[in-house]
Swiss-Prot record:
It comes from Pyropia yezoensis. The lineage of its organism: Eukaryota, Rhodophyta, Bangiophyceae, Bangiales, Bangiaceae. Belongs to the universal ribosomal protein uL1 family. InterPro entries: Ribosom_uL1_bac-type (IPR005878), Ribosomal_uL1 (IPR002143), Ribosomal_uL1-like (IPR023674), Ribosomal_uL1/biogenesis (IPR028364), Ribosomal_uL1_3-a/b-sand (IPR016095), Ribosomal_uL1_CS (IPR023673). Its main location: plastid. This is Large ribosomal subunit protein uL1c.
Length: 229
C-alpha cells in the first residue's frame, strides 16, 4: 500500500473526489502549494490515443502567453550567419563542431538545443547523449529551424513542448503556483486549444478522457473538461 507523508495527506484532505471547474481547480492548486520553493504547476492529460500507431501520435509545441516562470537556457548549433543570429538573439550556449564535441564529452548545461537543418547530419552522433534527456533537435518540436533567432526568443519566452507518452498521457507544465489565478487559467486554456488544434488524424472515440492538475509537491485535482470549453 502506497504511503503518503503527513504533509501530503493533509493537503489531499482538502481535495474532494469530484470534478472541479478550471477556476476551482487552479484555486485549490494554489492553496495546496506550500513547499519551501516555487512549485511548478503541472497538467496531466489522458487522451484517447494509442501512440503505437503513427496516426495517433501527438507531439507539438505551444507558447504560453504568461510564460513558464522558469529561466530557460538555450543552446544553438549552427554555422556562419545563423550562428551570429543565435548569439544576437541571446542564446546562452552556441557553436558548431566544437560544441558538438563538448556535448559528446558531457556538456549539458542547457534546457533546449536548437539546430539548423544543415548541421543535423553532424548532430546525429549525439543521439545517445541527447535522446534519453529529450534534448535531440526535432522539426516537430520546433528545434530544427533556419529561423534560429525566432526559436531562441520563443523558447526563452514561454514556448513548451508536449507529447503523449506510451500510455496516451501528456504531462506539461503551465507556470508556477505563485502565478495569479488568471494567468494560470489563461495558460491552461492555451494548452487545451493547442491539443485540440493538433488532434491526430487517427484519433478515435472520445478524445479528452481525464484532466488533472497538481503542483510539484501537491495533490492531484481533477478538472471537469467541459469547464474548459
Amino acid at each position: 500500500m502506497k504511503k503518503f507523508s503527513r504533509r501530503l495527506t493533509t493537503l489531499k484532505s482538502k481535495v474532494e473526489p469530484k470534478l472541479y471547474t478550471i477556476n476551482e481547480a487552479v484555486s485549490i492548486l494554489k492553496a495546496t502549494s506550500n513547499a519551501k520553493f516555487k512549485e511548478t504547476a503541472e497538467a496531466h492529460i489522458a487522451l484517447g490515443l494509442n501512440p503505437k500507431y503513427a496516426d495517433q501520435q501527438l507531439r507539438a509545441t505551444v507558447i504560453l502567453p504568461k510564460g513558464t516562470g522558469k529561466l530557460i537556457k538555450v543552446a544553438v548549433i549552427a554555422k556562419g550567419e545563423k550562428l551570429t543570429e543565435a548569439i544576437s538573439a541571446g542564446a546562452d550556449v552556441s557553436g558548431s563542431e566544437e560544441l558538438i564535441d563538448e556535448i559528446l564529452k558531457g556538456r549539458l548545461d542547457f534546457d533546449k538545443l536548437i539546430a539548423t537543418p544543415d548541421v543535423m547530419p553532424l548532430i546525429a552522433k549525439l543521439g545517445r547523449v541527447l535522446g534519453p534527456r529529450g534534448l535531440m533537435p526535432s522539426p516537430k518540436a520546433g528545434t530544427v529551424t533556419l529561423d534560429v533567432a525566432k526559436a531562441v526568443n520563443e523558447f526563452k519566452g514561454g514556448k513548451v513542448e508536449y507529447r503523449v507518452d506510451r500510455t496516451g498521457i501528456i504531462h506539461v507544465p503551465f507556470g508556477k503556483s505563485s502565478f495569479s489565478q488568471e494567468d494560470l487559467v489563461l495558460n491552461l486554456q492555451t494548452i487545451k486549444e493547442s491539443i485540440d488544434r493538433n488532434k491526430p488524424s487517427g484519433a478515435k472515440g472520445k478524445y479528452w478522457k481525464t484532466f488533472f492538475l497538481s503542483s510539484t509537491m501537491g495533490p492531484s485535482i481533477q478538472i471537469d473538461i467541459t469547464s474548459l470549453l
